[in-house]
Amino acid sequence: MAWSNIGLCANSPNSFSELPSPENFSFDKFNNISLKLELVINQRATGHITEVERIGEQYFLQRQDLIAVGVTAKSLPGTEDRIDVSSIAGVNVRYLQSSLQLAIDVPPNWLPMQSLSAHDMGRFSPAKFGRGGLFNYNVFGVYENESQQKEVSIDHEIRAFSEFGVFSTTGIFKSNFHRDVQSQQSSQYTRFDTGYEYANQARRLRLEVGDYIVRPLSWSQPVRMAGIQLSHDFSMRPDVVTTPLPAFYGEVTAPTTLDLFINGFKTDSMAVGPGPFVINDIPMLSGAGEATVIATDAQGRQTVMTSPFFLSSDLLKTGFTSYSASIGALREEFGNASNEYGAGGVVVAMRHGMTDWLTLETQAEAKDDLVVAGLGFVSNAFNLGTVDASFRVSNFKDQSSSYALSYSYQSRLFSFAARTQVEQADFYTLSHLPNYEKLNKGEEASLKSRHVSQVNMGVRLGDWGSLSGGYFDIQQTDSSSRTLNLTYSYALPFDINMSLSYNHSIGGQAVTLAQFSLPFGSLGGSAGLTLKREDDGDVRGRVGYSRLAPIKGGWGINLAHDLNEDPENRKQADLTYRASWAQFRGGLNGTIGNYDYFAEMAGSVSTLDGKIFPANEVYDSFAVVSTSGFDGIPVKYENQIVGVTDEDGYLLVPWATAYYTAKYEIDPLTLPANAAFSTTEQFASIHAGYGYLLEFPIELQIALSMTVVDENHLVLPLGTFGRSETGLVSQIGWDGFTYFEGVDPGSYILFYPQGQSPCKVSIEGLYERESQKIQTLNSQVCLKTEDEAAL
């Protein structure tokens, strides 16, 4: 009946005529209308909804609305607040009725500059530290067959660290034995360095108290002192780009993906909105090269932009400054005496980036009767290379000076460097202290004038290998030497690497050297052959095989045998074993019947988190990975397996690089099935000289599965909610099956069947708390309960 009524209404000839006629109807009402639309600028939705007045094909909106979505104010014509955007030259407007948007395309240069960084900042994290100590040791013993002399040395480092800094001391103990003396012949302990260091990473400041090496400039000499040194050290922040990097400018008309290639290798990918952009901090190596940006828009259209560059790592960015200031006593007889110190001295050095193409350098050093001052600069010579120059003056006697000038250029295929340095006679600095002290005592120790020049050049020949050469000229008052060397390297078939060298001392002898090496890939190790020919025609050689001990532990070997006309060719053989707690090496070298023997043990003992960890030598920082007591868990450092955790769930990683944000991982596949963990990888950087504990929280969960039935032995309804005494929740599945997992399920579980009273399953005593497997319980009866406390 309802359908027939509708049909009757639709077919009635008078039905529509009886409807009220619209008054003043006109299509102009749709052409002249106020709309609420989202503005889309150059295909980028802005999320900005505003009132747009449409009059025919004209669209009016407020000037401020355009500025709010990124159009620069200076690009808009006129000064009126209300703008007809459809009438602006160079602007295209479309009304997108289905999405209630107004699409406005403007010239890209009307939009603000977008600054993008191609430098990876994601891996930086503030350096961390722990509280503990470290003892590095190296025990080395040698037996010389000919003299039958035995020598044992113990090299050590003791280090303690906390939030207050790092204290360390190093030294060596030596003891000699002779065949004609039954007791110890001689023993000596020599201290090397003892000092305290505190670093402030945020301010990039390093304070050193005790023994230290003055941080020199490229044209000055290092000096050992004992006192105080304060330095501004950029190495604490490897994420901070100190070198002026080229910027890449461009513009796009729509949202685009940019792919950055440096010398043909893809280094980064980033998204950019419409408008002009600049890519800052482009990562690259020193020298000349080419940066290419491929821009791909949403329709897949690509635009390629290329720009050459030249980069020098010796330059500082504009406004960047590094410095060091040192005061203390000059160290004498280092390595031979423990506590020999001379007169006091002061050294101050500074580098400052004046512009992105000019860095100024200065250094001054002084003691009671000696002052040395110098000034230098590093410059980018119009992207054609780097120029480095310096000049120093010493007030010794009638004053003497030194100057240096160098030029270098490097590209993918070619490199060139030239340097000359001249020192007048008796040019003294603090590094010449032993000679200076002898002069004060009336001894002959004058320094000769010295002129050193060198030229180095290299070229890559593509599939034909590479060629490099150098010329060295050293001229002194009473002697001189000039040396020329050439080296050609080429990759032969079967992965054999060949290197041919020619060294000629002009006016002296010439030596030709041929070297071949063959890596064995997955088999490990490599074989090598060296042939050496001298001017007299004598040809000598050496053949050998070497395999490093794996970083995660294992055996290494080194074998060598001389090849010459002498029947008693020298031989060498040593074996290395790397354990998780130390490294052992032993071997021999010499001729048959006259071998010298040696043995070495090197490692460390550290303390952190109240635990003691024997491990291999720690040269810088170290990390201790904790897996909450689970043993045998593989640990990776920078995607490489470095060992497994011990019986207490710890592994020491001894080669962490200070301030480098490294990735540490654990492999959870060997964990029990009911182990719960929140993460399997962490990123961390560690202060220089420190140890840090990286904890991976892991908990064993109790996993219970069961079938639940009611008092009539019927399975509980599908989807019935359940909650344990400790708050663990689950639901009833098919056939009454349910599963609970957690650290502690408690002693009972409450279930809430829909439309029925709650019921309770007692599980106390039915499971093992230490089990590492999923425990399947027998079918459990859920008993109705009215205990509100239990609910």
Residue ranges and their predicted role:
Residues 640-649, 726-737:
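Short, acidic Ser/Thr/Gly-rich low-complexity loop/linker segments typical of extracellular
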Residues 39, 250, 623-627, 702-711:
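A short, amphipathic beta-strand motif
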Residues 135-139, 169-171, 207-209, 323-327, ...:
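Membrane-embedded beta-strand positions of outer-membrane beta-barrel proteins
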Residues 101-106, 311-318, 611, 680-700, ...:
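Extracellular beta-sheet/turn segments enriched in Thr/Pro/Gly and aliphatic residues
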Residues 125-128, 152-164, 184-201, 342-356, ...:
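Feature captures outer-membrane beta-barrel proteins of Gram-negative bacteria and organelles
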Residues 30-37, 44-50, 629-640, 711-726:
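Short, ordered, surface-exposed loop/turn motifs in non-cytosolic proteins
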Residues 3-242, 535-606, 614:
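Post-signal-peptide, soluble extracytosolic/periplasmic N-terminal scaffold domains
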Residues 53-61, 282-288, 650-676, 688, ...:
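Short Pro-Gly-centered beta-turn/loop motif in secreted/extracellular proteins
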